[in-house]
Amino acid sequence: MTRPLVGVLALQGDVREHLAALNDSGADAVGIRRPEELEKIDGLVIPGGESTTMSKLLQIFELLEPLKARLRDGLPAYGSCAGMILLASEILDTRPDAQHLGAIDMTVRRNAFGRQVDSFESDLEFEGIVGDPMRAVFIRAPWVERVGDDVQVLARVPESGGAAAGRIVAVRQGAVVATSFHPEVTGDRRVHELFVDIVRGV
């Protein structure tokens, strides 16, 4: 599999930025809006946006159950920000009717870093990614409050991060990866390259 076909859930969020990042990282990338399109892809990116709105759109576009089924069957997936929330098995501070995919055994707190004005950037050490620390952009971002035994913690907010110091902001379980931050907006392709490598290896 030289250039795997990776879909980007194209309902909301930084779709174009993820498509560009995937193309730069050695994948052929395509927007996904219909259930039948899920069958053709080797991996899926779930972009940021507003998680409760995205969960409604998944139901409206009849993607929720087909996507859950593909994830159960081992489809590699990567979620950033709201995508992380949707991939979680448990979500705190969300609407009672919000749907999620349950692909990673973790508890996530929505908007944990605060409102838009509380958005910030930080340099992170990221497990499995070599080179300089990764510049991470957090926009009304979640953090992870609990992970299951099979979940690998990939990054935490550094000690210089104030009240958020030590909080988990990147995880992996099997072929599913999630980050609180938005690597698609910085030009640093290393998270997307890691995910494309995971897709190739499945």
Curated annotation (Swiss-Prot):
State the Gene Ontology BP annotations. glutamine catabolic process; pyridoxal phosphate biosynthetic process; pyridoxine metabolic process
PROSITE patterns reported in the protein's UniProt record? PDXT_SNO_1, PDXT_SNO_2
InterPro entries, A to Z: Class_I_gatase-like, PdxT/SNO, PdxT/SNO_CS
Instruction: State a single Gene Ontology molecular function.
Output: pyridoxal 5'-phosphate synthase (glutamine hydrolysing) activity
EC id: 4.3.3.6, 3.5.1.2
Swiss-Prot/TrEMBL keywords = Glutamine amidotransferase, Hydrolase, Lyase, Pyridoxal phosphate
**HAMAP family (alphabetical):** PdxT
Q: Which family does it belong to?
A: Belongs to the glutaminase PdxT/SNO family.
Protein name, please? Pyridoxal 5'-phosphate synthase subunit PdxT
